[in-house]
Amino acid sequence: MYISKSFIPILKNNPSEAKIKSHQLMLRVGMIKQSSAGIYSWLPLGFKVMKKIEQIVREEQNKIGAQEILMPTIQPSDIWKESGRYDDYGDEMLRIKDRQGREMLYGPTNEELVTDIFRSSVKSYKSLPQLLYHIQWKFRDEVRPRFGIMRGREFYMKDAYSFDVNDEDATFSYNKFFFSYLKTFKRLELSAIPMAADTGPIGGNLSHEFIILADTGESKIFTDKRVFDLGSEGTVLDRQSLQDLRKKYEQYYAVADEKFNKNEFEEKVSEENRLITKGIEVGHIFYFGDKYSKALNAAVDLPGGKKDFVKMGSYGIGVSRLVGAIIEAKYDQKDEIMKWPFSVAPYELAIIPMINKNDTSALDKANKLFKHFESKNIDTIIDDMDENLSSKIKKFNLIGVPYQIILGKNSEDNLLEFKEIGKDPKSLTLDQITQILTEQKLKN
């Protein structure tokens, strides 16, 4: 792929309307374009990053046995009236009518729809548990959309739902998603803290939100610093191991402002371990028992001829928001270097030849290298623009391509100038470079 053939509308400067660095960078390097307030078109660069994030989310959901479905964005109002949330949801819900005058809505969430799907098909406890998820666009009519895709009205989200026969099994399902989210964010190189949270309009009595630290975050958080030393290593998918993992995190104080209790914070956390800062919510999980199954009559047959309403949970990750969250965590605004995790970078390698109309040897060499790396499944782009090498390197630092090969006029035959973003270049052989890149792919 030549950059001259790519649709990457880069701006020279940060747009004045953007207030936080993720919004600034995404507009500047042509990842998104605003369509209307809080609604964006995703251009090739941004869409590519988002799809890579989506795939990591999908893989981690599949690993815990969740099954992917796809529900529509437009939902009938009937099931929302049946659950009692049609009027309760307020002005955030976009209500519409079709040509027959039927009341419809643009889905802000999917508890009602997935419960309707479940109740039409599953009748016996023998079919449980069921873990279903989808990745789809949502719309919530925010009063004041801001910060680009971080607080937009339309957003891309992974929603999962669990259906179990009793509270014990439902807790097991909840803990599976708790574990899955920790693994997902680790693969995205984000330090996400699971925090006790209010259930809000979703309902229920158990909830955690996953927060990453960021100065631009809208959530004020209060936590014990020692929570950052924890991880999910050694955890396996059995009841005790997953319960132990959750308890390990819950032993440390970590809450957002709506759950904050000053006396409890000071009692449980020593002064040297107290951290009060801001963060961005990137995931939220809920257990709400039979709130929706009872309202929508989603019951299964039990042994002995009895029936009972299934126990449910819901589990969300903001896929589009994660694009902005990674930028907030990884973008060095001072030096204009974006350090995407290798697994989600828009390109994995940039080949940067010096362009000379009278000497095509550097471009010819770039083309040969492109074919080599293409055969190794390395996502590569060639900068064939007539610009100086310094400008090209700055451009790829801003876009966030993690590795670069620079072909200047003094390039040696057997050695290549190889540069990791933000570091000094090295002279390496093609085999050495190939090994570095293939090892990076294997890590992810």
From Swiss-Prot:
Signal peptide boundaries: none
Gene Ontology molecular function: ATP binding; proline-tRNA ligase activity
UniProt entry tagged with the keyword Transmembrane: no
Gene Ontology terms: cellular component: cytosol
PROSITE patterns, alphabetized: AA_TRNA_LIGASE_II
Reactions the enzyme catalyzes: tRNA(Pro) + L-proline + ATP = L-prolyl-tRNA(Pro) + AMP + diphosphate
Protein's cellular compartments: Cytoplasm
Matches recorded under InterPro entries: aa-tRNA-synt_IIb, aa-tRNA-synth_II, aa-tRNA-synth_II/BPL/LPL, Anticodon-bd, Anticodon-bd_dom_sf, Pro-tRNA-ligase_IIa, Pro-tRNA-synth_IIa_bac-type, Pro-tRNA_synthetase
CDD domains linked to this entry: ProRS_core_prok
EC number, UniProt record: 6.1.1.15
Keywords from the UniProt entry: Aminoacyl-tRNA synthetase, ATP-binding, Cytoplasm, Ligase, Nucleotide-binding, Protein biosynthesis
Superkingdom of the source species: Bacteria
Role description: Catalyzes the attachment of proline to tRNA(Pro) in a two-step reaction: proline is first activated by ATP to form Pro-AMP and then transferred to the acceptor end of tRNA(Pro).
Quaternary assembly: Homodimer.
Listed name of the protein: Proline--tRNA ligase
